[in-house]
């Protein structure tokens, strides 16, 4: 059995309600999804043992139920109703029991959600494969670290630094890194992605990854300013965010694709490419949850 299919079989066992749609997305994008899932399965089993794939499937199911519940609350309230930032920090980002299943789901959705699969295609084909040779790359809010590890797997010439505010997330990233074979080129650290007033933050990078971070911030504008400050003249940015897609820790509500686009361009970079795909919604819904990704370049 191929490594990618281990996840699909685990969903059949542990996340039956969500398995058919995940399999349909995988089958429609087999090569691309396998590019993500094959190394992920190897790293997961090498790190966490033979139960890792089933644990990931359970985490995915828990995440999907949570998203559905949050979207129902959003429909009733007419706006995001997140917890306070201190509650999010303690109950999500610093709570290992919550963060570990959350982190598994946060990477599996790229292969199993129709609204996310084009993100991983853009990430690979229009970001990673277009970076300058020997590029240095910074990932903001790296979480599980898998995007950085996939970058290292795809581009053996690049160096990557990943930062995240969540200690459990960075612990996961470092454990996966230890078995990935990329320890000489990838580093993860606990750090606020928006801390730009420190000497190390003056360094510029040829590649910056900011995947699904903006919606977690009270105000995303400083994020775009930080990206602009750190991007080298020849650099590329992979940026993504959620639109009308409520979750427990989604704080900033985007309603239109033009909103993050305008924020990016107001900070300086040019948007050279944008994709946005919607999730399936119930008839009569007020909101259409979407996932939007952009490639940014220096002007």
Question: Where are each of the predicted segments found?
Answer:
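Conserved beta-strand signature within the Rossmann-like core of class I S-adenosyl-L-methionine
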Residues: 235-242
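Conserved alpha-helix/loop element of class I SAM-dependent methyltransferases that forms part
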Residues: 101, 114-133
